[in-house]
Amino acid sequence: MNRQIIVNNTYGEKRIAILEDRKLVELHVMHSEEGNCLSNIYSGIIRRVLPGMQSAFVEFGGTRTGFIHANDLKLNITYEEYQKNLESDDDEDAGSEDQSQETQSEPRKHTDITEYAKEGNRILVQVVKEPIGQKGAKLTTHISLAGRYCVLLPTITHIGVSRRINDREKRDELKEFGQKVLKKGYGIILRTLAAETDIKTIEKEVVFLIKKWISIQNTFQKGRGTALIEPALDPMLDFVQNTAMNELSEIVVDNKNDEKAVRDYFAFYGENPDDKVKFYDLPYPIFDYYSIEPEVTKLVKKKIWLKSGGFLIIEQTEALTVIDVNTGKFVGKGDLESTVVKTNCEAAEEIAYHLRLRNLAGIIVVDFIDMRNQANKKKVIAKLEHELEKDPAKCTVFYFTRLGLIQITRKRTTESNISSLTEPCPYCSGNGIIRSRETVTFQIFREIKKHVKLYGSRVLTVQAHPETIFALEQKYSGEFEKLKKELRISVKTESDNSLHRESFSVEGK
């Protein structure tokens, strides 16, 4: 697999596109006025303790307070507890890199928030989940510092080695190195890329991360109030950090500062970036040149056509995402069950692709086309799970419910691309629908009757949108005339293009 990272930086908006074998698989959009707070480390102040919820609200410098659970304040926790804390939010599975457990598990103990949190206390926190919708950022006091080859855990005693490292000898070598780090009082997770380098290089990174941690502590101790202590790695560099060099074919940027940042990053690890890093200065916009812009435009569409002629409908709500699978134009050449299975398998591949591309997370419910054969159901599940393995975020698939629905959970850390690229429609206030002309017309009829009965009006004026006036005077002219005759009134109508389709006024004399 060849991976390309294409970065478009334009006056306050940075867009990062990840292409695998020239196909867009991820898009990340950041706006300078909003900022990207995921993994940032802050000096925070506890503003409100909620014993009933075993949690607290923390002011940390964001636009609203963050949320921290008692277990994220607790001292001397095990790695298992740390993982459970990450997994506990919204009943979603954690999306961290797979790694083996090298320490013994301990039962999770009950934690009393009042033992660790007092209003006004200043604490060092890290954002583990960005604000999404009405929810504030999720915070923890258990800081993790990620590098290219390892993750340093300053507050947790743990050695972990990525499960993706299969070489037994290499695993033993990395665990032995981890023991040395553990003796210094730090936990460590050796990442997948650690298998591709030597211990000396990993040791250099560990020394760098320990120095960073000491600097963070010193800055926190000297400071007062809320403040950003340590910004997270630029998302652009984060993607570089998580990509093996033999898989990264190129990183193309259209901003000189971004080019310097990438070159400096490679230089730190002693790697020559000349054949990987490219500065784009052609007249065409960079996303147009790489055929990314048309794909970005499609991201907000609900309907996705499958190659066979079937289609998906993706509906994102506050609570969950619903995906409906339909055969559409596809009629197949065999029996109905074969047609359905083929459409469902094709849909499974496309669903996994769009969960990652659109960054849809939390609870996802899929309504596949009904299948009678259990073997066919297992085939579709297997296809879905296989395709989801390509996703860096942790996904869990649950078998068909009694209603024939598939449930998926995908770890959420940032908002979806639909949320990043769109805003609620100002015309319908985000409902996606407005009252029909017919409904508004009959509302006007009722309002006219009310005016006559309450105020004794005999001459009235109705102001409304032109389409509503058309419905009054044309489509329902008979009913309108009957109403005027019955009430013995005269009604003047006035069209106003500036009015909302649902708005109208009735005034009487």
Where are these regions (language model features)?
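Charged, low-complexity terminal tails
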Residues: M1-L139
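Active-site phosphate-binding and catalytic loops of NTP-dependent enzymes
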Residues: N2-I5, V25-C37, R108-E115, I132-L139, ...
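Gly-rich Lys/Arg/Thr-decorated short loops/hinges at beta-loop-alpha junctions or inter-strand turns
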Residues: R22, I156-H158, F220-G223, V331-G332
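Phosphate-interacting basic helix/loop segments used at nucleotide- and nucleic-acid interfaces
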Residues: V29, E34-M53, T103-P131, R171-L174, ...
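Conserved glycine-centered short motifs in functionally critical loops
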Residues: M53-A56, F60, R64, E130-L153, ...
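Metal-dependent catalytic core segments for phosphate chemistry
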Residues: H69, D264-P294, K298-C345
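A short alpha->loop->secondary-structure connector
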Residues: L75, Q134-C150, E169, A267-D275
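Charged, low-complexity intrinsically disordered tails
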Residues: I159-E293, V300, T414-K509
